[in-house]
């Protein structure tokens, strides 16, 4: 197996196959569930808006892949600093049956100098998730933070407040995941000594098998080749799947989605 084939198979099994569009429908989510079951293995999860969780759960069960996890988003995409609303949305997502919640960190508050609200928001959402055995990923929106010190600070605050994963981006801003921001965030995980318990998720802009290979290489360099499993690493993407399947000899590499 070539290096690209090997990394593509790894990446496929680490995907949170995503649709987070204003025009999402039951039909589109059902199609996403079907796509998550591929000839070479299943994606780790799908990521959808909370209202679609019941139809996704039903579809995944009916197609014989109940092990594919369902992730959803809260405080999304703007990362507001109202803790009560973020917590209410997170509790609602859990009630819908989410296995994982990706919550947006109040990054604009951090940019304005307020570190406390981010900590308090993540901590509140973590307590709700932990009580239901739901994984919490925290989106810090690196493309808006821009500054390395702010990316580092948002990562540290999220981890201290209980994040199970730190995630680069919503996919809804001009700049999403980059290898540079990925390295900074994973270095925080390493420097804090939490690589056993905290994972990393690049999202938005990871579109090709070659892109995925680059991101996995950074993880392998920092943590060794065994670290990036589904408990420690995910790709938030949709169009990536077609490219990975093409690299693995399935399909033409074309995708209907741009995430």
Curated annotation (Swiss-Prot):
Pathway: Carbohydrate degradation; 2-deoxy-D-ribose 1-phosphate degradation; D-glyceraldehyde 3-phosphate and acetaldehyde from 2-deoxy-alpha-D-ribose 1-phosphate: step 2/2. One of its GO terms (molecular function) is deoxyribose-phosphate aldolase activity. The keyword Lyase applies. GO terms for cellular component: cytoplasm. SMART domains: DeoC. CDD domains: DeoC. Disulfide bonds: none annotated. It is an enzyme of class 4 (lyase). It catalyses: 2-deoxy-D-ribose 5-phosphate = D-glyceraldehyde 3-phosphate + acetaldehyde. Belongs to the DeoC/FbaB aldolase family. DeoC type 2 subfamily. HAMAP family: DeoC_type2. This is Deoxyribose-phosphate aldolase. It comes from Escherichia coli O139:H28 (strain E24377A / ETEC). The lineage of its organism: Bacteria, Pseudomonadati, Pseudomonadota, Gammaproteobacteria, Enterobacterales. The gene is deoC.
């Amino acid at each position: 197996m070539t290096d690209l084939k090997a990394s593509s198979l790894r990446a496929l099994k680490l995907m949170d196959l995503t649709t987070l569009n204003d025009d999402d429908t039951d039909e589109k989510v059902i199609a996403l569930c079907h796509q998550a079951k591929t000839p070479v293995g299943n994606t780790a999860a799908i990521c959808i808006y909370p209202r679609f969780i019941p139809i996704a759960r039903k579809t995944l069960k009916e197609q014989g892949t109940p092990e594919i996890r369902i992730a959803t988003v809260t405080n999304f995409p703007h990362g507001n600093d109202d803790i009560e609303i973020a917590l209410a949305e997170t509790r609602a997502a859990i009630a819908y049956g989410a296995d994982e919640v990706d919550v947006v960190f109040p990054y604009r508050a951090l940019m304005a100098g307020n570190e406390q609200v981010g900590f308090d928001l993540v901590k509140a959402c973590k307590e709700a998730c932990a009580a239901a055995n739901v994984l919490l990923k925290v989106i810090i929106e690196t493309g808006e933070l821009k500054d390395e010190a702010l990316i580092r600070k948002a990562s540290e605050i999220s981890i201290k407040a209980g994040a199970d994963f730190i995630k680069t981006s919503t996919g809804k801003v001009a700049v999403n995941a980059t290898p540079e921001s990925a390295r900074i965030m994973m270095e925080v995980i390493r420097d804090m000594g939490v690589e056993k318990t905290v994972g990393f998720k690049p999202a938005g802009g990871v579109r090709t098998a070659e892109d995925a290979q680059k991101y996995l290489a950074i993880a392998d360099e920092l943590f060794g080749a065994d670290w990036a499993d589904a408990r420690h690493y995910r790709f938030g993407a949709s169009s990536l799947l077609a490219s990975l399947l093409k690299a693995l000899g399935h399909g033409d590499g074309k995708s209907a989605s741009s995430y």
